[in-house]
């Protein structure tokens, strides 16, 4: 519903920057009717700080770990996350607009670069860019639709099963067992 935008901010156990600051930057672009769900993962300190700052704001829902995360991602107009492989792949498989923020150096920055280069996500390199990119995606549903279409072109919806099949086959090979045909 364009009148009630939903943004999900997933911090993860390793954090995704200063969550209270990120919340402060996202809330103004949501307006009075928008909603922000913040998932802090196992980062108890981030949850405590966010609760102190925003626990009484009806536009903000604060969560620790959420299992499964899929329903929250599917309900989001925009997902703000680091570019960890699991959450990013899950979001792209579902088809959710993504803004990457504060990726951890190494594989997450490589993931962010790949997602940005292939138009699968927007990468907010600064806090100001975070605000601008979330606002832009919320104002322009056609940009979200274009991003989701690119995600569906790149991401195999059956990738989880294929990965599991590879792992089973390789494990069986290491154990000297034959893998039954699927």
Where are the predicted features?
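A donor-sugar binding/catalytic signature common to diverse glycosyltransferases
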Residues: 69-110
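C-terminal alpha-helical cap of glycosyltransferases
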Residues: 156-182
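Donor-nucleotide binding loops and adjacent catalytic segments primarily
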Residues: 1-78, 109
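A short, well-ordered alpha-helix in the C-terminal region of glycosyltransferases
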Residues: 143-157
């Amino acid at each position: 519903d364009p009148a009630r935008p939903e943004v999900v901010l997933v911090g993860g156990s390793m954090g995704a920057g200063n969550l209270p600051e990120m919340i402060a930057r996202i809330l103004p672009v949501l307006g009075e009717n928008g909603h922000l769900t913040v998932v802090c993962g196992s980062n108890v300190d981030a949850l405590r700080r966010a609760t102190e700052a925003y626990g009484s704001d009806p536009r903000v829902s604060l969560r620790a770990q959420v299992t499964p995360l899929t329903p929250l991602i599917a309900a989001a107009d925009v997902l703000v996350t680091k570019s960890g492989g699991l959450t990013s792949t899950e979001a792209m498989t579902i088809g959710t607009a993504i803004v990457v923020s504060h990726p951890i150096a190494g594989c997450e920055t490589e993931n962010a670069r790949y997602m940005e280069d292939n138009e699968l996500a927007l990468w907010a390199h600064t806090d100001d860019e975070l605000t601008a990119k979330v606002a832009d995606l919320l104002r322009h549903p056609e940009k979200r639709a274009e991003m989701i279409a690119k995600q569906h072109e790149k991401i195999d919806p059956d990738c989880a099963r294929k990965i599991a099949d590879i792992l089973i086959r390789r494990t069986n090979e290491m154990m000297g067992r034959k893998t039954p045909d699927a």
